[in-house]
């Protein structure tokens, strides 16, 4: 089995929606009075479908055809109003609508190639919405402690392994492996990531017309520290 097909098929089992994520999204949507959301890097549509359950109009986009296919099937099966289409966060020109909010969660943003592309992507986000919610791995912690391995995830059917390789150019090779319990089949893949530290992210947000309105270390809304597992930032577009 191809690694990315396997990851798509078992994504919801590996990364199920948790209570704090659900509560955070509901609170954020209510606080910012959002009526429409563009979910960039939507994966299998978990956040998009959950957001649509609050009555918000949602379009989820992803670079993976497999993810979009699964998202559409999930939405149809449960009668969700969320819609999904194929798009790359680096080029959102085919999306003609504007939205109240733009979500870029699940470490999607770290797939930019560096500072220049980060600036280009955040500028594009500002053309699609007035409120922005970002979530990445806390790369301040990863870089400071030279973390080479993330916690192993075990489910009823598989074990998911994740390792970092630190590259001389400052990027990270994110090495992933899925081992299936029954068949003992092993599939693996590698993604290239740009480890965005929080100060760099906040500086680039300001440079691209965004003002940070909230910062947390997880979806429980704990204060962000260098030890936090994640970086969660909310921002509002600065009026021109």
Q: Which residue ranges define each predicted feature?
A:
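SAM-dependent methyltransferase
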Residues: 133-204
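Class I SAM-dependent methyltransferase SAM/SAH-binding core
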Residues: 45-91
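Short conserved loop adjoining the S-adenosyl-L-methionine
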Residues: 91-97
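A short glycine-rich, Lys/Arg-flanked "PGG" loop and its adjoining helix->strand segment in the class I
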Residues: 117-131
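C-terminal lobe and adjacent flexible extensions of AdoMet/dcAdoMet transferase-like proteins
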Residues: 200-240
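Conserved class I S-adenosyl-L-methionine
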Residues: 1-32, 34-43
């Amino acid at each position: 089995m191809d690694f990315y097909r396997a990851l798509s098929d078992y994504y919801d089992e590996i990364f199920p929606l948790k209570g704090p994520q659900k509560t955070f999204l509901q609170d954020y949507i209510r606080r910012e009075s959002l009526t429409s959301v563009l979910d960039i890097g939507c994966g299998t549509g978990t956040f998009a479908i959950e957001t649509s359950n609050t009555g918000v109009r949602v379009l989820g986009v992803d670079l993976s055809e497999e993810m979009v296919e699964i998202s559409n099937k999930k939405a149809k099966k449960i009668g969700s109003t969320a819609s999904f289409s194929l798009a790359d966060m680096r080029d959102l020109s085919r999306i003609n609508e504007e939205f109240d909010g733009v979500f870029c969660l699940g470490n999607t943003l770290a797939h930019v190639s560096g500072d220049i592309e980060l600036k280009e992507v955040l500028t594009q986000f500002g053309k699609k919405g007035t409120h922005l919610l970002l979530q990445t791995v806390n790369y301040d912690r990863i870089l400071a402690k030279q973390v080479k391995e993330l916690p192993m995830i075990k489910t009823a059917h598989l074990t998911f392994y994740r390792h970092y390789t630190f590259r001389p150019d400052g990027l990270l090779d994110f090495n992933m492996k899925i081992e299936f319990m029954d068949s003992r089949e092993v599939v693996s893949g590698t993604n290239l990531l740009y480890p965005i530290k929080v100060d760099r992210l906040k500086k680039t947000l300001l440079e691209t017309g965004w003002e940070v309105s909230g910062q947390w270390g997880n979806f429980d809304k704990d204060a962000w520290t260098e030890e936090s597992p994640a970086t969660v930032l909310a921002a509002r577009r600065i009026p021109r």
